[in-house]
A protein has these predicted regions:
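Non-catalytic alpha-helical scaffolds and adjoining flexible linkers that form interface surfaces
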Residues: 1-189
Length: 189
């Protein structure tokens, strides 16, 4: 196999390495015939970035069916991994990826309008969030100003925290019983 010590492919099979691949087979189990790097391999600048990349991989493995192909999703993934390797703001990268992933899968969150009324989110109001219906006015919850920031992807610290909560709630609602192992690593940081 490709993982054998003497395999001509083994040197190219690195985690998070962009590859041009060719595989063949009739069943779900395919044989890898070609694995060539698309670009120069860059390692992650820190362990927190690497653990974030593991989280991204886990999300994709749990949320995408094995036979599903998506050039748009691949571009989002590749951009996310590239940004993580450059040691940019990890929280920004992860929140953007989660929002993009939900959008590609058809579960895009509407941060601009109130549920049931189609009124714009009011900056002066608070809103509660439900994955099945969206945002509705409430005595407590998320500030409309913060929801606007998330909508524009200009994340303040508060917007990052709110986006993380909203994204997690949405992912767990639509994809029950996710057991994301990489979250355990973040408890150490």
């Amino acid at each position: 196999g490709a993982k054998r010590k003497n395999s001509r492919l083994s040197g190219n099979l690195e985690p998070f390495q962009c590859l041009n691949i060719d595989f063949r087979g009739r069943s779900d189990l395919k044989t890898l015939y070609l694995a060539e790097p698309c670009e120069v391999f860059n390692d992650f600048k820190g362990s927190e970035n690497l653990y974030s990349a593991f989280y991204i991989n886990e999300l994709i493995n749990f949320l995408i069916t094995q036979s599903e192909e998506s050039a748009e999703l691949f571009d989002i993934y590749k951009n996310c991994i590239s940004n993580l390797k450059d040691k940019k703001s990890i929280e920004n990268i992860l929140r953007n990826f989660e929002l993009d992933l939900l959008g590609v899968l058809g579960y895009e969150i509407n941060f601009s309008t109130e549920y049931g009324t189609n009124n714009d989110i009011d900056f002066e109001q608070k809103y509660k969030y439900s994955p099945q219906s969206g945002f509705s006015k409430s005595a407590s919850g998320f500030d409309g100003k913060i929801l606007n920031e998330i909508s524009k992807r200009s994340f303040s610290r508060e917007a990052l925290i709110a986006s993380k909560e909203i994204n997690r709630k949405t992912i767990e609602y639509y994809f029950e019983e996710l057991n994301i192992k990489s979250r355990v690593f973040f408890k150490w940081f």
